[in-house]
Amino acid sequence: MSRLRRIIAVWAAKATGFACRITGKQGVTLAGQIALKIDPDILKELSGQVKEKIFVTCGTNGKTTTNNLLCSAIEAEGKKVVCNHTGSNMLNGVAAAFAQNASLSGNLKADYACIEVDEASTVRIFPHFKPDYMVLTNLFRDQLDRYGEIDITMNLLKKAMEWYR
């Protein structure tokens, strides 16, 4: 049953992404939201199919640029990479990146994954997969409206890293 759910979730994510693009929207997070509703384990299942390593990029500034540079460097070596290029870096966006890179049979043929993750979303994303490497660009106080003090952001990252134990 879980394989069937994964296949349906992948199809739904791809169809949602396509429909949003033809109507002039990105639709990345909506595609991920729908995929997770159909198969709550889709991120765990697809990320487990990455052959080599999973890189996660976090930080206040420069996440998208750093993540996309890392992805480009790996692709230049002829490797297949799952990447959330658009910076959709919360749970739905990350799920969409994996689902939209999967085949219609619900399988992922990727050597690496380069995933940008919002600092506060690490605690929601890391239970689904454990990255092999984390690139932390920086932590600044420019998002006080979202996270309060920088210590709160740092504690969120520490809590997320407890999943490694």
List each model region and its residues.
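Phosphate-binding loop of NTP-binding sites
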Residues: 4-165
